Structure formats: structure tokens, C-alpha cells
Amino acid sequence: MNYAYLNLDNIFLSLDELRSIIHGSEKEYYYGVALYEGDERVAYKSGAIKKTGKALAISTDVKDVVEALRGRCYSVDIDVPMREYKNYAKTVYGEVVSSIKTSKKCEKLDLIVTEGVIIAGERKAEKHTESILSHSKRPYSQSGTLNPEIGRIMVNLSESQREVYDPFVGTGTILIESRWLGLRCIGSDIDPVMITKSLANLRHFNYECEVFQADARNSPVRKVEALVTDPPYGRSFSPKGLKELYREFFYQATELVDGKLVFTTDFKFDWRDDLKSAGFKGVKIHTIYEHKSLSRAIYVVTK
């Protein structure tokens, strides 16, 4: 059994990203922690999961945990996602540390105390924050640009295993994250300036993607595994013009995508009825607060 320590600021989004990466569901869930079967290094490729590893002991009794770990050598970290267990966690930490050898040279041991349960596990992976930070430092960016962390989450939510197409490519966030994840990346934009900027950003990281100028409502792409994108929703469109753009794009998307459509928009818009009218059936929405003037909604849509 493996464990995933989730982002407490958006637990449901983290949990959904985990399910998408493992193409399945968690076996058990405690506040802030999911227990699952599959790849124990899931956190490395995630945008919202803090760390993952192999569970060694799961119990409400600290004695069980101590017996499972006794005599081993670890560098110990403790997490207490629920405040009411902080004092109990100190006791757990003390008993565990006194029964093992501790050294920073040894493997990381995560002790997580939540809902009265103690989860002890060997950490196998952490979120790759270095690449996320690196991808934020690119030649071209602009106001409202999707940040790499959200872009990575979106690509993972698509469950794509081969390719991703972004028909509103902008400065290339989705393509950059798709390529980092090892996927074939295709992008287009109606604005030639955005094509130039996205290509420059891709070259900056030595990433190769197929990028071309096209209207998202009439794309030359015929079929793609997953459609992941950040359509416009700013002041450049009137409310009527924006609604028409999205409606036409949704109808085009039903023809293009074999798997999932994942897109972001301002949370104040509700596109569920328009998506269903276009032929999509399943709609899941996650909200992410960014700053006082913008909260994004991530739509995960299936046919």
C-alpha cells in the first residue's frame, strides 16, 4: 500500500489528480492523506500532491508503528493535518524516534497523524518544485498567464497517455507541462503573436511541440486523445462574444477529443449547460483562488 500526502489548500483537486495519474481510485482516505495501489512515485509528476511513498505501518496504536519500525534508520518528518492531533503527534514522534536510529543520511520516513490514525511510510517522491519554478522563468509571459503548477495539474487531470492539444496556446504553459510529462504536445492560436511567444518559450527549455496558427473553432486537427486549454475570459471579449466563442469551441471539441476536455475559466462563468448542449455528459469542476480579482474554475469534461 502507498500513501499520498495532499495539498491541504485544495484537497479535492489533489485527490482527483491522484486518481487521474493512477487511473483508478484510492483504497482509503483520511484527512489530507490517500492510501492507494500503484506507482509509489506519483508525487514527482504531480502539481498538487506534496509527497508519496510506501506505507510501512497504518494503525491507531503507536505500539504497532514502533514494532514495524524498530531498529531501522531514518530521517523523520512528521505531518499533522488536523490541529487537534498536534499534542498526540508529539507523543507518537517521541516513541518512534526512541525506537529507531536517526540520521539525515538515511531514507526519509514520513509520520502522518490524522483522524487518530498513524501512517508511517518511506518517502519515494516529492512534487518536483524545481521544474515548476524553472517553467515560470521563461522569456514571455503576460497578465493572466496560467501558472505551471495549474498547467501540470490540468494535464494530469486529462489522463492523457500519448498526446495533448491546446487550441488556445497563449504563451505555451500547457505545452511546456505536457512535454515535461513526456507527452506529444500540439498547440495552436488564432493570434500569430502568441505563436511566436509560445515557440520562443518552448525553445528556451529545449522542448519540441507542433505549433501552428488556427482558429480553435475550426481547427485542422481531426482527432486527439486529450484537449487541455486555457481559453480567453478577460476584457478582450464582450459577454455575448465570449459566450459565442465558448459555445462554438465546445461543439468543435466534441468532434476533436477522444478522451477528456480540461479547461480553465473565471469561476463566475457557468458552462455546464453549454457543455451538455454540445454533447458532453460528465462535468466536474474544481475552483482555485489565485488573487482577489481572479479565482479559476478547472472543468474536467467527458463525452
Located regions from the model:
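Class I S-adenosyl-L-methionine-dependent methyltransferase catalytic core
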Residues: 1-64, 102-108, 113-303
